[in-house]
Amino acid sequence: YELIMENKDDLAKILTAEMGKPLAEALGEITYGASFVEWFSEEAKRVYGDTIPGHQDDKRIVVVKQPIGVVGAITPWNFPNAMITRKVAPALAVGCSVVLRPPTQTPLSALALAYLADKAGMPPGIFNVVMGTDSSGMGKELCSNDLVRKITFTGSTEVGRILMRQCSD
């Protein structure tokens, strides 16, 4: 959060340069995106299990919450910073690593956020950005790779249906 806010002017300029959003709106998006990082990092402190009374007085049920594993995140071009932080921050907060597939139109915001994550000391392999022109191939890989346990996607209904089919195959 702090590094995003310290670098908000540069992040906004990157966002404006890559997709044409007016600078004032880009600054607003950076601040909005940073709020997800702040909120989910604070919520991470409250991710713990539950102890539930059992069916007998001397029994109890213990619920343990564990990270699901690798999360594949596919984001749209129109809110490149906010959609990334909205998807990546909760996954990281609960201990999952992320493979982010930003859109081909706006990859620079993703790379800038990955750079800041690295600068913050995030270990290699935790927040990963994959780029390329074969969008359907990369989506299919995220959906079919056994290491990826969850997909988060924002985009068109048509692509959402394709991803849903690929995930269920």
Tell me the role of every PLM-derived stretch.
Residues Y1-Y48, D58:
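Glycine-rich loop-to-alpha-helix module at the N-terminal edge of alpha/beta enzyme cores
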Residues D50-P124:
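Conserved small-residue-rich beta-alpha loop and adjacent elements
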Residues M5, L92, S168:
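Anion (oxyanion) recognition and catalysis
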Residues L15, V37, G95, F127, ...:
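Residue-level signal for inorganic ion chemistry
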Residues D10, K21, Y32, F79, ...:
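Short alpha-helical
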Residues V70, P103, K119-D169:
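Conserved NAD(P)+-binding/catalytic subdomain of aldehyde/semialdehyde dehydrogenases
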Residues T16-A24, P76, C96, S135, ...:
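A broad detector of the eukaryotic-type serine/threonine protein kinase catalytic domain
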Residues V37, A110-L113, L142, L163:
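Hydrophobic packing residues within well-ordered alpha-helices of enzyme cores
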